[in-house]
Amino acid sequence: MGDAKVARTYNQDHKARQYAKGRRRVSAYIAWSYPAEANRNPAVLDNRFSTMTEVRRVLWPAYEGPQWDPSRFQQGIGGSLELFFWAWVRFQRVVEEVTGHALPMFQRVDQAGFALPLDERVLADTDTLFVFGLDHMVTEQVPAPAEIEAVRLFLEREGTCLVIGPHHDVGQSPDLQERNLEYLHHGDALVPRQQRFGSYTRALMNGLGIPVENRWGLRPAVSAAENGRIAPLTIARDLDERGWLAGVRNFNFHMHLPHYAVTTEDARSVHVLARQPIDLSRPHPFTNAGNKEFNTLVWMRPEGRRAGDVLVVDSTVFSTLFGADESLERFWKNIATAG
C-alpha cells in the first residue's frame, strides 16, 4: 500500500454513508478477535495463523523487500493478519469504483481491543454485507442472540444481500493419519494438521436458517494447458437468475478451500451455483469417497420474510493474496452492483 495517493488514517469512527438509488453501500465484517488470533502461542502447532517469520521462511524470497523488514512490519502472528488487509485493498477499490462508496472493514475485536458486535452500527448504512469467517474455533467467537436478530432484520429490508463465508475446516478427524492425508493433499506448509475456522459464521448461519456447513480444505485443479491457471468453475447458469456469475469463468487459486455442504434436502431453497474441480492427483478423504468437485458458491433467493439474498462463498475469493484476474473482478462487480 506504499503507492496510496491519499494519507491513511487509523483510530477513526465510521461515518455513515447516505443512501443513493443505484449506489449500493457495501460493508465487510471480519468475525475474528484480532488479539485472540495474534496472541496465540507460536509454540502450539495447531489452530493458529502463521507468524510472519514463518511466512518469510516458507515463501522466501517473496517477503524480503524493505516493506517487510522488522523495523516496518510485524514479524509475529499479527504480521500474517495484516497481510489479509493488504490483500483486500484491491477488492475495496473495485467496490468503491463501481458504487461511489468506500468499503469499510469492521472487526469483531480490532487491534486495539475495541469490540464491535454485529449490530446497527454496522448494518444501518449497509445494503450488501460480507461476513468473513476467519476466526479459529479455539477463540470461541459466537454471535449473541441480539446479533442474529439484527442480521435477520437486516435481511428483511428490500434489496439487501448477505455474503457469508466460514473459512476451511482442516483436520477435524481425531485420526492423525487422516489429518496428515489432508495436509499432503493441500500441500501448504503454512497450514497445520488441524486448522478449524468459522465458529461465528457457523452459529450465525444456524441462527438464520442457512443450511450450509463448511467442510474440509480442498486443493483446486489447475489447467496445464493454461500455465497452471485454476480450472474453470462448473456453473449452473440455469439457476443463476440474478446473474451473480455473469461473465465469470473462475475464482482464484488457493491450496485449501472449503466445501460448502448443503445440509437440507429442500432443493428449492438452496442452490449450488458453482462447483470447483479438485486436484485428483493428491488423495483426500473427500475424493476417496468419489467426489471430484466441491461446492464453492451457494445462493438462497429471498423467501418469506427474508427479502434479501444470501450467498455463501469463501473470503479468499475477495483477496488478492492468492492472485486475482478479470474473471474474479467481474464477480466482485456483480455482487457490488446487484440491486
Question: Across the structure, where does each feature detected by a protein language model lie?
Answer:
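Short, surface-exposed patches at the edges or C-terminal ends of soluble domains, predominantly
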Residues: 2-339
